[in-house]
Each structure stands twice: as C-alpha cells, then as structure tokens.
C-alpha cells in the first residue's frame, strides 16, 4: 500500500536539500523542478516589507512559475525569510557577508518566516506561513571563523549562514517553533491540505 494517492508525484519548485528530505521522509513522492525566478527583484518590486508577506509572495511565485510549464500538476513552492526585529536578511553572498550576519545575529533572537503555496494551472489552492523564533548564543570572533572554516560554502546557501539540521545547531541557545518550519517547509499544514484533497491514505 502506498501513502500517496495522487495520480502523479507532487512537483517541488525548489532545489533545497532540506525541503526534499522533509517530503521524502513524509512519504510524499515528488519531482524537484527549481523555479528560475529573480527572488530579490520580485521582493523589491512588490513593495512588501513584512518578512512573512515576502516569504508568502515568493513561495507563490515559485510555484506559479513552475506550474506554467507543468499543466495539470500540483506544484509546491516554498520560501523562508529571516527577520531581526524589523530588518530582513538575504542569503550571504560570500564568507565575509556570512561572518557579518553571524555577528549581527549572535546573542539575539531572530525569526524565521517559512511559507508554502500549492498551485495547479496557475491557480493558488493553498498557502500558509509559519514562524519559528531562534535564539543564537553569543559568539566570539574566533568561534565565528572556526564555524565558517568547518561549514565552508554551505554558509552561503541559507539565510542566516546556518543550517539548523547540520552544524548550525552549535550556534544556538534556544529554538522555539516547529522543526519543519525551521527547515523551511511547514509540513503539518501542508499535509492537512493534501488530506483535504484526498491525496493521502493517512
């Protein structure tokens, strides 16, 4: 017996390894087809400033973009933004930018806003945004440099310069929120939607 009842696998409009792992572990078959969109350009042109609103827009835009090329398929888009107070962060461009982000986040609490959207034939069928609050411990300059030495280029693949599912866990004193939200894919609301569409056996 299979858990997934859909006629075709879900399409995941993302190349995120963490999101792919979350879906795979939940028994959801998918085809990973990243969306080739200008995320920063779309966010800036939107005029939106709230991190959750930006994440929601980008998740929807990613899913809609891929949906245009795969008619009839259920396409899942996801995005995550990081906010320190009223200030939003982007993925660091290089090691120096990653170190700067870590200096700013160290010893403070920030928020991760994770959004999902499900689109079919250009129509958004489901959208959700979840928030996790992360408390990074105080870090010395030597600790920041040692961390960046160990993680290498991975520091530039995630906003905040860390992956909590990996070595990034060493940076934190406290984590408040859903584990899947932290990984960038609010899974429980998504599963609820899929069940409502009779796509899951459980």
Swiss-Prot record:
Tell me the keywords, alphabetical order.
Cytoplasm, Hydrolase, Nucleotide metabolism
Q: Indicate yes or no for the key word tRNA-binding.
A: no
Catalytic activity of the protein: a ribonucleoside 5'-triphosphate + H2O = a ribonucleoside 5'-phosphate + diphosphate + H(+); a 2'-deoxyribonucleoside 5'-triphosphate + H2O = a 2'-deoxyribonucleoside 5'-phosphate + diphosphate + H(+)
Q: Which GO terms describe its cellular component?
A: cytoplasm
Q: Which cofactor does it need?
A: a divalent metal cation
GO MF annotation terms: nucleoside triphosphate diphosphatase activity
User: Recorded E.C. number(s)?
Assistant: 3.6.1.9
Give, as one word, the top-level EC class.
hydrolase
Q: Does the record carry Acetylation as a key word?
A: no
Q: What is its main location?
A: cytoplasm
> Which InterPro entries does this one have?
ITPase-like_fam, Maf-like
Q: Which GO terms describe its biological process?
A: nucleotide metabolic process
Describe the family membership recorded for this protein in Swiss-Prot or TrEMBL: Belongs to the Maf family.
Q: What does this protein do?
A: Nucleoside triphosphate pyrophosphatase. May have a dual role in cell division arrest and in preventing the incorporation of modified nucleotides into cellular nucleic acids.
What name goes with this protein? Answer: Nucleoside triphosphate pyrophosphatase
Look up and give the organism this protein is from. Rhodopseudomonas palustris (strain ATCC BAA-98 / CGA009)
Q: What is the lineage of its organism?
A: Bacteria, Pseudomonadati, Pseudomonadota, Alphaproteobacteria, Hyphomicrobiales
